[in-house]
C-alpha cells in the first residue's frame, strides 16, 4: 500500500475535477479524499495499491475535460489506512 498527496495547479476548480477523481478512485479501490483549496488548487490524498494510486495520479496530471492543468506536485507519505473516499 502507498499514499500520495497531490496538489494540482491550473484551471482546476469548477470543472468537476473533484468528482472525476472520486469516481476514478472508487473504480480502482483507492481510499482518501479530494478538496478545493483557497488558492485555486485541488488537493488529494490517495491510498491504495501502487498501480491503482498511480493511475489516479496520472489522471490528475491531465484532469477532466474543461480543466487546464499547469503543474502537479506529488509527494509520498506513510499510509494511514484510510477507508472510503470523500470530497471536501
Task: Name these PLM-found stretches.
Residues 1-88:
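Intrinsically disordered, low-complexity, mixed-charge
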Amino acid at each position: 500500500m502507498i499514499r500520495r498527496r497531490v496538489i494540482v495547479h491550473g484551471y482546476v476548480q469548477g470543472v468537476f475535477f473533484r468528482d472525476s477523481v472520486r469516481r476514478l478512485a472508487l473504480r480502482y479501490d483507492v481510499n482518501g479524499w479530494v478538496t478545493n483549496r483557497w488558492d485555486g488548487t485541488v488537493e488529494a490524498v490517495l491510498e491504495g495499491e501502487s498501480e491503482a494510486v498511480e493511475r489516479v495520479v496520472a489522471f490528475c496530471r491531465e484532469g477532466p475535460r474543461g480543466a487546464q492543468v499547469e503543474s502537479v506536485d506529488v509527494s509520498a507519505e506513510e499510509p494511514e489506512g484510510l477507508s472510503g473516499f470523500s470530497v471536501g
